[in-house]
Amino acid sequence: MKLPEINLTDVITLIIQEIAHRSETFAHIDVHRVLVCLASNRSNSRGGTFGKLVPLRFKDGAETVRYRGRLYAMPRLNHGGLEQRYLIYFYHPRFFNLPPLEKLKVVFHELYHISPDFNGDVRRMGKRKALHGGLRERFDELFEEEVREFYAYIKKTPYIKFLNMNAHALKSSFKKISGHRMKMPKPVVVG
């Protein structure tokens, strides 16, 4: 018998809250100002994206940036009465078809992009290739131990049942699958 409903983004938000609470590296993250969303992609294509962080501010938390003589701003986004600093998109079904540990690696990867100042900007890793600082593999090594420690913890919680479910298992287990969906915001000309 199917359960009535699951909100995928709410469950992932709760997992992120656990990460921020249990990991010193992510303690600066205010989960109430990070909106988790679903995006769609084709399940049968190889490679591709599992998750994406969208910062809602520019370098050093600036609200505007001048580019080619024009002034740009990101749209302001309020959720739950709070202005959001970041959006994190997880791609359905691709992300959900990963094994549990790989899902957590994607979540940690996207969270690590959040600036330590939590100012709406990304963590800058260098002058060139600022997002990953060169090789992505090295980027993922920066939080690899924390992923393993968190996985050891989460395996003892009810969240592991969710992490073990792929897209088919979710569809088979719930009458309704929901989550926040929104078009990815882009900078707009303000002057």
Each language-model region and where it sits:
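Metalloprotease/metallohydrolase-associated module, dominated by Zn2+-dependent proteases
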Residues: 2-7, 12-88, 117-191
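Generic "edge-of-domain/loop-turn" microfeature
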Residues: 43, 95-97, 113
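Short pre-active-site segment immediately N-terminal to the catalytic Zn-binding motif
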Residues: 89-106
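Active-site recognition of the HExxH zinc-binding catalytic motif
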Residues: 103-117
